[in-house]
Amino acid sequence: MDQVEATSTRRKGLWTTLAITTVSGASAVVIALPETSHADPEVPTPVPPSTATTPHPRRRRIPGQPADNAQAGAPAPAPNGQQRPPRRRRMIPTRAPPPAGAPPNGAPPAAPNGAPPPPVDPNAPPPPPADPNAGRIPNSYVLPAGWVESDASHLDYGSALLSKVTGPPPMPDQPPPVANDTRIVMGRVDQKLYASAEANNAKAAVGLGSDMGEFFMPYPGTRINQDSTPLNGANGSTGSASYYEVKFSDASKPNGQIWTGVIGSANAGNRQRWFVVWLGTSNDPVDKVAAKALAESIQAWTPPPAPPAAPGGPGAPAPGAPGAPAPGAPAAPGVTAPAAPAPAAPGAPAAPGAPAPEPGQAPAVEVSPTPTPTPQQTLSA
């Protein structure tokens, strides 16, 4: 029986050496070649999504804190094993759509028990018309819109001066600003005017307009656009109006305008006439419609009766004295009753020839007319 030596010094065979060399070379070739040199690409397998979070490999978990893979919003465990009260959910209010027929957003809801509006009576009388005398002032004429009364104490003729308002008053207690290129003068036609000699209102208006034009516009020029208009006032009063313009020789002056109206009562026994003179320029023209309405609104103003004297007052007869009539009793036969006070009327203008007054000047002295006026020299149209 042969025994193998533990430390054999026998050389290995040739075939064994070749086999070992071949295996070692094949392994080296396999390791040097890339893995995908002769292989198909590998398709990755999809991984289903997961809500769990993988903890960071280097992050240490602190005792008492929730784990990283805990769901967001989950309540933390109560310390010492105590049960934490349930978390109250927060509800978001939602607005329900308005029901059909509801008022739009922002509109107040109608009162459910509100009374419906009363029906309109088809047989109700129409509202009363506007009072045409609503703007009547104590001088008994209707003031034109946009005009105010001015101080007439400085006028040489007439009893009323109207000015056109151009803006609000500067202070509450001050008069408003007025225009300086237009004005209205009113008064009574009496013996101080040359036109009073004309019984015909149309002729009186033409004559008064000529005199007033020479007075207010004493510059050479030509009269143009002349016309006349009849007037029919209240209480049967009638009259006439005359209008013309003056084209001055000085081209720097705007054309002057003048409207003159004469109107009087129809009572032949106590006839009274008044005049209206409306002055203007081409920059601030005369309103013919308003001028006609102003002249036709003039009425003879009768002042209210004087209050009766108090019994026992100065000048009053003693009660029961002879000859003292009872209150309201007619006068005794043969005794003339005291005459009633004369109605107050606008004053009369003075004669032409005085300088044209301006609103706000000091009172001027009244000038009497000369027997024969000197007409203004104007060119024919």
UniProtKB/Swiss-Prot annotation:
Keyword Nucleotide-binding: no
Disordered: annotated span: 35-137, 300-381
Ranges annotated as biased composition (Pro residues): 95-131, 302-330
Ranges of Low complexity composition bias in the record: 63-84
Superkingdom to which the source organism belongs: Bacteria
Location(s) in or outside the cell: Secreted
Major localization listed first in the record, in broad terms: secreted
A GO term, aspect molecular function: extracellular matrix binding
Originating organism: Mycobacterium avium
TM annotation in the entry: none
Annotated keywords: Secreted, Signal
Listed InterPro entries: FAP (IPR010801)
Protein name, as recorded: Alanine and proline-rich secreted protein Apa
First and last residue of the signal peptide: 1-32
GO cellular component: extracellular region
Pfam families assigned: FAP (PF07174)
Claim: Signal is one of the keywords in the record: yes
Family the UniProt entry places it in: Belongs to the Apa family.
